[in-house]
Amino acid sequence: MTLTVTVSLLSSPLHSVCTSAGARFTGFAGWELPLQFQGLMQEHLAVRERAGLFDISHMGKFQLRGSGLRAALQRLLPSDLTTLLPGQAQYSVLLNEAGGCLDDLIVYWQGIVDGVEQAFLIVNAATTDSDRLWLTEHLPPAIALLDLSQDLALVAIQGPQAIAFLQPLVSCDLAELPRFSHTVTSIAGQPAFVARTGYTGEDGCEVMLPPAAAITLWQQLTAAGVVPCGLGARDTLRLEAAMPLYGHELDTDTNPLEAGLGWVVHLDRNPDFLGRDRLVQAKTNGLERRLVGLELPGRNIARHGYPVAIADTTVGIVTSGSWSPTLSKAIALAYVPPALANLGQELWVEIRGKQVPATVVKRPFYRGSQFR
C-alpha cells in the first residue's frame, strides 16, 4: 500500500487578486506564492524601468514589546541599535553562539509606545518558526513577542517610479521618508505600516496592513499601471543587486563577514553580542572564504551548489546564479578562498559536467535607484 502525504500550503490574503491577475503559483517556505504573472523578463524590467508590485505576505512579522527591548536585541544582533531613533530601521543578522547566521532580518525601531519600548522585526518565511523559538528562548521574560505573520498582509512596490505611484494612496508625505525609515499612515481607511525598504536594488516601499486594505491597495496600484511581479523576478532583481538569500548566501555555517555583511557588524560599538568572540577570531585570523560575484560567458547559468574550481581543484561553490535581464549576461554569487577573491580572477564553474570559465567581478552587478 502506498501512503500519500498531502502538505497543505498557506495562502496569502492576496491569493485571490493574484489569481485574477493570471499568477502562476509555486510552493515556497510552506506558502503558495506567485512565481510569475506575465513573464519574468517583463516583470524584472518593469521594476528596473518603472515600478513593480510584489506580494510578500509570506515574510515573518514579529512585534516585540517590553522594558529593555533595545538592549535585549543588541545582545542577539551584531549591529549597534543604540543610535536608532523611532522611525528608523536597521538591516542585520541573527547569530548563533558560533557566529553563524540564523537569519537576516530588518529591525524597525518604534521607540516608546504607550510607555513601553517597541519594535517590529521582518524575518524570512523559511525561518519564521525557528526565529520565533530562538527569540523566545533568548529574550528576557519581560519582552513579549506577538507573531503577526498570518494576520497582516505585506506588499512591496519597487522601482524608480514606485514612490510616485504610491503617494496618492497614502496620507503621509513619502518624500519625507528617507531610506531605511518607516511610518504609520492610512491606506483605504486602515492603518498601514510603510517602510522605505526593499529587496530589488531599486527605490520603493514595503507596506504592512490588514488584508482587506491590502487587496484595495493592490487593485489601485495595478489599475494605475504598476506591474504585478512574482518570486522569479524578485530573485533575479535581488541577485543583480547582490543581496543575500537565506539558505543560499547565508546559513548557520556562514558568518556575516564571509558573506560581505561586515557593514552590519559593529564590533567597536556593540561589545557583547552572541557569537562576537567567533567573529573577532575570524577577523583576527583571516576568513576562510569570501562571497564574490562571477560573470560567465554566453548563457552559461551557474546554479546553486555548482562547484567552482581553479585548474583541476575544487575551491568553492556557487550560491546563486541566473541570467541577468538588465545586463544581458550570466551572473552568479559564489564562495571562494580570499586569495581567489580579487577582481579579475579567472576561475571555472562546472555546469552539467562541463568546465565553463568565470571571472570575479564587482558586486553589486547592477546599482539601481536605491543606490542613487
Swiss-Prot record:
One of its GO terms (molecular function) is transaminase activity. Its EC number is 2.1.2.10. Gene3D superfamilies: Aminomethyltransferase beta-barrel domains, Aminomethyltransferase fragment, Probable tRNA modification gtpase trme, domain 1. It catalyses: N(6)-[(R)-S(8)-aminomethyldihydrolipoyl]-L-lysyl-[protein] + (6S)-5,6,7,8-tetrahydrofolate = N(6)-[(R)-dihydrolipoyl]-L-lysyl-[protein] + (6R)-5,10-methylene-5,6,7,8-tetrahydrofolate + NH4(+). Coiled coil: none annotated. The glycine cleavage system catalyzes the degradation of glycine. This is Aminomethyltransferase. The glycine cleavage system is composed of four proteins: P, T, L and H. Keywords: Aminotransferase, Transferase. Belongs to the GcvT family. GO terms for cellular component: cytosol; glycine cleavage complex. GO terms for biological process: glycine decarboxylation via glycine cleavage system. The keyword Transferase applies.
